[in-house]
Amino acid sequence: MGANRLAGGALPLQVGAGTMATGSSWAWKPIARNALFARAYHSCDVVQGKLLLFGGLKSGEPKEPPLGDMVAFDPTLLTAETVGPNGGDRRSHHDTAVLANRWLCVVGGWDGAHRVSAVCCWDTEQGQWERWAEGPSNDPPVGLSSHTCTKVSEHELRVVGREGGLRTQRRFASIYTLRVNPATKTYWYKEEESRTASRAGHSAMLLRDAGGYQLVVFGGRDSSDCEVAGRWGKGKIHVESIHAPKMTEQLSRLVGSENGSRQAPKGLRHQSCTVVGPFAVAFGGETLTKGRDTVCNDLYVYDTRCSPPSWFRFPCSDRGQKRVGHRTCLWNDKLYLVGGFGPDGKTPCPEICVLEIP
């Protein structure tokens, strides 16, 4: 569908394509279909009202290099365009943070040959990549992939975990504070004294608590343990919370129909996870508890309104909605599902869907 058009060229979309995938009381409704969306282990962030997709893999072939293109999807107009051609840094299994609603900060990832810890930024106002330099006190990890990078403020990110096979999995995972300065285009890592269990392909949730905020991580290893990877007082976090009253009310109604559990999903990795008010919504991923048919399509809701918080699982009977290496984004009171590999774990899905809870 013209996926090789030059940067800046708007592309026609198939709108409303596909069928709705339903769980018992929820549904992923396809709203757009385009070859540009067909990727996995990419990033997806909202910048200036558009969803920016960067990098990822087009197939499950181990020798295929990652993508390096930047695609912008307008959720209001349902239009897409390539805003950055496939000529810059290539990345998959990376993570991102948006600074000042302008810079898309890409942290670490797999470049096709190595795991890297370098930081590069896409300037949405200039429409170009910026190569940021290491600061004088930089103490970087050896390499990062399948890690998480969580924004704490406009100048501070928290990086947790990195790749490691189950047989060679390290006992502990280091936690890094990553300082960033868009004015000087510099960054520097500092390793924290605290650690978590070794994780890769996990999720990180920045959640409010009585004292301020805590960063909770789950998944990415063969257990159901949740861990706290950082705590901050109320005045230390400078991140805008996204207003989503409709979706918050829908999630409240959804969990009200089920019994929760204190146990997080066991042995799940490469799922998506997005915080929505007092909830976190996780979907899909790959289970480590089975040898075959490992890609999942369950929806999980983490409810922090009670103490201790509870997990709620909502299964889906539609195998076609199994996803791994996908992303979810919250924008304008809607949760978007973008890309990922399908049930076979190697064929990318070219759809963008929205979560519907009747």
Where are these regions (language model features)?
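Kelch-like beta-propeller repeat domains
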Residues: 1-358
